[in-house]
Amino acid sequence: MSSRDFSNDLFSINIEENAGCVVSAKVQANPLVTQKCHKEALKTVKKNVVLPGFRKGKAPDNIVESRYSTQMEQELRRLFLRASFEALSQMCDRKPLSPKAVRSSAIDTCNPVNGGSVSFLYEAFPVIPSLPWEQLSLPDPEPVKEISEEDLENGLKNVAYFFATKTPVTRPSQEGDFISLSLYVSKRGDENSTPVAIFENKYFKISEEDMTDSFKARFLNVSTGHRVEEEIGSEDIQSFLNGDLLTFTVNAVIEISSPEMDDEKARQLQAESLEDLKKKLRIQLENQAKEAQHQKRFSDAEDALAQLIDFDLPESLLQEREELLSREKLLNARLVKYCSDSELEEQKQALLEEAKADARKAVKLLFLTQKVFSEKGLSISREELQYMMDVCSRERFGGYPPKDISNEMIQELVLVARDRLTYRKAIEAISSEKKDLEVVPS
């Protein structure tokens, strides 16, 4: 724990710093501050009262203070608390993460004549030391994957699905079929429990590439209408889903028959011939390979930056991200990888440790990328910001955002878009040549 002081003509602040970026602060204000707050409080209360013989807002100050002492006290304390928080945010180098990061605030004293004091307990922005760029360990870029004839043939098979005949069948499902599944969760034995859809009419291909072995075994050789009920033994999953019974329903078994690609079909896809389609497909696959290489380089840069330096992180952000990732990993294991309850229990500790490590990495990168963005002098253009806002808007509202979108929502979209661009640009700077990362310490 360390203690430090900050002061100006109006305020004096003492802070004590604790682990988890938790800071306790004592803000002392001189009488000029409380006098100003008292004057503003009086003005606010006067505007809202009407006394016999006086126009609204024109009653004498002493009468208003006498008759509306409770309202005056409440407004004075509100204004004084706000002024103290603003002083804390502006004067102290351990600023609160946000108003929501304040765990508690208490007005110890507040008097127009004698001044006042407020005690705060809050989470602050972390202190990040200078980044030791010379220690950055970033592997050399991997070569772009070459597109093989097998890759091209597999690509053509996927294109052929566009022309495939999709026939619902009554026979049991076979390897290579598609099945339409719905999954509901409910509370076993509860007559008032209404099943809740986890997904409906979702299509799965019965194959080793697209299904885990246990999931595939459940839905191979089953017919339309087949139902699988499965009790959830894991208390974690029960809590996440608010239920203990999973019900899978096979809505349809669909046989796929894909034709051989030829010149005629290629022309329907805006190609001159089958050979021309192959050339275009190769270009598409090469572009995908380049993007995969870029994503791998991006991921390597994230790892390198996260490992570059350690520092204390905000406790609540870390806990919030860890809880989110733990939930995702456990649900993914149970509902996507289709682990049994016993398999999930065996994997649980490893998954939770993985979530803890991933959470720490994510929160570290949140703050490190902001530091890199600042140190490197990076910038965001209006066009980039507008594009990213459009992306965020589509994610939030779909293709048609509401016409009466509020200013508050617009500000939220701006902040989210700016955060994403800041993160991306900082990581892309890391993924460039190491020699380009040398910066003058601020």
Swiss-Prot record:
UniProt GO cellular component terms: cytoplasm
Subcellular locations according to the entry: Cytoplasm
Coiled-coil region list: none
Major site of localization recorded for this protein: cytoplasm
SUPFAM superfamilies from the UniProt entry: Triger factor/SurA peptide-binding domain-like, Trigger factor ribosome-binding domain
Reactions catalysed: [protein]-peptidylproline (omega=180) = [protein]-peptidylproline (omega=0)
EC numbers for this chain: 5.2.1.8
This protein's record includes keyword Transferase: no
Domain of life, source organism: Bacteria
Entry keywords, A to Z: Cell cycle, Cell division, Chaperone, Cytoplasm, Isomerase, Rotamase
Protein function: Involved in protein export. Acts as a chaperone by maintaining the newly synthesized protein in an open conformation. Functions as a peptidyl-prolyl cis-trans isomerase.
Name of the protein: Trigger factor
Originating species: Chlamydia trachomatis serovar D (strain ATCC VR-885 / DSM 19411 / UW-3/Cx)
